[in-house]
Amino acid sequence: MKKFALATIFALATTSAFAGFNGNNSQGGFQQAAPAAISVKQALSAADNSMITLVGNITQQIDDDEFWFTDGTGQIKIEIKKRVWNGLNVDSKDKVKIYGKLDNEVFEKAELDVLRIEKAE
């Protein structure tokens, strides 16, 4: 009798463990709006580590992941890692929107580390 009671208690106790968790299924997180696009001229004088959005054209490839970018107000060197491209193909005629972190050291020219790139509308 004790064995039967013990087995029953064990069976009832473990059924809730096998039920699974069905909690919050929403994909959460804070969605901040991207910063408004500024000109290259403004970006060249912005503070180091600023998050910048630019709209313009990639005019020339310098290295594997370095390019010249212009919007008509100035020119800035940008760095786009291969993973950031995400299958996007552009040429110098395509207008693109880039989001990145400005690297503006005191004794060096400003450079933008691109975190996201997309074709501009």
Curated annotation (Swiss-Prot):
SUPFAM superfamilies: Hypothetical protein YgiW. It comes from the Bacteria. Its main location: periplasm. Keywords: Periplasm, Signal. One of its GO terms (cellular component) is periplasmic space. InterPro entries: BOBF_sf, BOF, Ca-regulated_OB-fold, YgiW/YdeI. Residues 1-19 form the signal peptide. Gene3D superfamilies: Bacterial OB-fold. It is found in: Periplasm. To E.coli YgiW. This is Uncharacterized protein HI_1709.
